[in-house]
From Swiss-Prot:
Gene Ontology CC: one annotated term: cell body
Gene: HSPA1L
High-level lineage: Eukaryota, Metazoa, Chordata, Craniata, Vertebrata
Protein name as annotated: Heat shock 70 kDa protein 1-like
Region of interest (Substrate-binding domain (SBD)), residue spans: 396-511
PANTHER family: HEAT SHOCK PROTEIN 70KDA
Length: 641
């Protein structure tokens, strides 16, 4: 594949599903994966023989829950002892371990224990999205815009960028999901004067509310709020708990400790939840759920709404908070935009509509695809796409949390206020606290609390060599500079000597080192090569199997009676049966062995078959265009649990 210089893709890397789009020929194409789905599960599975990503991984989760990793987005950029990580670990079937304060996922792959950083798991999903785009475009793609929740802090953004690098992508920019949705929306709404838009994004794992003003192609984010831990999965959890209780009542058995049963129940619950968005009742039918018991039951929409009532109602709190932060009355909002699959739930729509006094909600954008759509447009802008559609679009993003430093008494002195438009640069003069102080410790924090101890320490550095002077005399100029990706540079300069020191907050708290990233890039290539070998092996195995079965059916064809000698027929059948028995006993053989076996079989069969067909043919198998030696490559059908 040749790389096309000018193409960049937009990737919505979601907690539960991901989506990829590209802007070409003046419009956005959302790209379907190899299964024909326009969204791909953010799942990676490891087995004894291979690594699976996307639909294939999610489809086998019931059989292999310990080694199927999802929700990497909940781990990325966090510390192991983060309360979010600790509480989520209780719900995950896979094991999370602590390595130097960072969480790693422990799985068994090809018979060995392996531990992966969340960045590596996310990079595998990004690789899948990259390959999906490449299959559609027909050439290699390296440039991408990746989206993150507005609430992500600096280390989470940086870790997401690292995941892109490991996947072999050049990450042009990390942008906020609601901002991306606003772009998708803004394209359709160009030229209507200033509009205030509220974006309500309830996805599989995160919930974001953002208020933007769109004016003449300029987007400005006024406020963001939300809950990093609310989404479709939480609604699934409520259904799972409900049915676990029902199973207890009906069958006096507790299935909650059986991971496979719970996983199968969860899959059925997710399906039921989707059904309830369009029907008032959904049926669940799970054969042999636990100890041979079939579980057939149903749930009404009303019951589902009751089970999730507090979660649904809770979605309005961030709406109110965002309005307060934007200093805006709800009557001032022109448009309410729904993003994320969970916004299809009728009750969620009703609550939001009632809150805005019956206003129409905007559902014109497919809620699953809006974010990737916007990311694809942003990617085109950054690559210098000259088409009229994207020419006049300017994007102003915001800092999700206030940034500042610690001053005397542990006070948080804010330099960049939360919701400030980025990129931005703020400078302030500070001084010494005691006489003849030789240096100052600059400690950088993010957060909204008055005292730094309640906020999040991003990094610290010393500025030394300050000439002796009474307290309050030295002038130390501190500059906070955030770039368009939300990455922070802090510089401190002593005005009298010109001595300076700086820090780029790319996070000591969980940032991967350059060496680690390089190692992971190499690992990713190695895994990809292994996946390729595995695919070739399976193709060779299938080719042998198909050839043997085709030969057996060819010589057993009624139409060939009398045309083939019994000796020849027996020879072929014996050889085919021998090959099939060998195959049965050597499922894990190498590609060369399968190929060798097939060639061996062909040497016996082909001369007989060729002689047969050259000798004229009148049977029903004539004229079917069957060519000996060409293995059938039909679809593989598998049951999904």
């Amino acid at each position: 594949m040749a790389a096309a210089k000018g193409t960049a893709i937009g990737i919505d890397l979601g907690t539960t599903y991901s989506c990829v789009g590209v802007f070409q020929h003046g419009k956005v194409e959302i790209i379907a994966n190899d299964q024909g789905n326009r969204t791909t599960p953010s799942y990676v599975a490891f087995t004894d023989t291979e690594r699976l990503i996307g639909d294939a991984a999610k489809n086998q989760v019931a059989m292999n829950p310990q080694n199927t990793v999802f929700d990497a987005k909940r781990l990325i950029g966090r510390k192991f002892n983060d309360p979010v990580v600790q509480s989520d670990m209780k719900l995950w079937p896979f094991q999370v371990i602590n390595e130097g304060g960072k969480p790693k996922v422990m799985v068994s792959y090809k018979g060995e224990k392996k531990a992966f950083y969340p960045e590596e798991i996310s990079s595998m999903v990004l690789t899948k999205m990259k390959e999906t785009a490449e299959a559609f475009l027909g050439y290699t793609v390296t440039n991408a815009v990746i989206t993150v929740p507005a609430y992500f802090n600096d280390s989470q953004r940086q870790a997401t960028k690292d995941a892109g690098v490991i996947a072999g992508l050049n990450v042009l920019r990390i942008i906020n999901e609601p901002t991306a949705a606003a772009i998708a929306y803004g394209l359709d709404k160009a030229g209507q004067g200033e509009r205030h838009v509220l974006i309500f994004d309830l996805g599989g794992g995160t919930f974001d509310v953002s208020i933007l003003t769109i004016d003449d192609g300029i987007f400005e984010v006024k406020a963001t709020a939300g809950d990093t831990h609310l989404g479709g999965e939480d609604f699934d959890n409520r259904l799972v708990s409900h049915f676990v209780e029902e199973f207890k009542r009906k069958h006096k058995k507790d299935i909650s400790q059986n991971k496979r049963a719970v996983r199968r129940l969860r899959t059925a619950c997710e399906r039921a939840k989707r059904t309830l968005s369009s029907s008032t009742q959904a049926n669940l039918e799970i054969d042999s759920l636990y100890e041979g018991i079939d579980f057939y039951t149903s749930i009404t929409r009303a019951r589902f709404e009751e089970l999730c009532a507090d979660l649904f109602r809770g979605t309005l709190e961030p709406v109110e908070k965002a309005l307060r932060d934007a200093k805006m009355d709800k009557a001032k909002i022109h448009d309410i935009v729904l993003v994320g699959g969970s916004t299809r739930i009728p009750k969620v729509q009703r609550l939001l509509q009632d809150y805005f006094n019956g206003r129409d909600l905007n559902k014109s954008i497919n809620p699953d695809e809006a974010v990737a759509y916007g990311a694809a447009v942003q990617a085109a802008i950054l690559m210098g796409d000259k088409s009229e559609k994207v020419q006049d679009l300017l994007l102003l993003d915001v800092a999700p949390l206030s940034l500042g430093l610690e001053t005397a008494g542990g006070v948080m002195t804010v330099l960049i206020k939360r919701n400030s438009t980025i990129p931005t640069k703020q400078t302030q003069i500070f001084t010494t606290y005691s006489d003849n102080q030789p240096g100052v410790l600059i400690q950088v924090y993010e957060g909204e609390r008055a005292m730094t101890r309640d906020n999040n320490l991003l990094g610290r550095f010393d500025l030394t060599g300050i000439p002796p002077a009474p307290r309050g005399v030295p002038q130390i100029e501190v500059t906070f500079d955030i770039d368009a990706n939300g990455i922070l540079n802090v510089t401190a300069t002593d005005k009298s000597t010109g001595k300076a020191n700086k820090i780029t907050i790319t996070n000591d708290k969980g940032r991967l080192s350059k060496e680690e990233i390089e190692r992971m890039v190499l690992d990713a290539e190695k895994y990809k090569a292994e996946d390729e070998v595995q695919r070739e092996k399976i193709a060779a195995k299938n080719a042998l199997e198909s050839y043997a079965f085709n030969m057996k059916s060819a010589v057993s064809d009624e139409g060939l009676k009398g045309k083939i000698s019994d000796a020849d027929k027996k020879k072929i059948l014996n050889k085919c049966n021998e090959a099939l028995s060998w195959l049965e006993a050597n499922q894990l053989a190498e590609k060369d062995e399968f190929d060798h076996k097939r060639r061996e079989l062909e040497q016996v069969c082909n001369p007989i078959i060729t002689k047969l067909y050259q000798g004229g043919c009148t049977g029903p198998s004539c004229g079917t265009g069957y060519t000996p030696g060409r293995a059938a490559t039909g679809p593989t059908i598998e049951e999904v649990d």
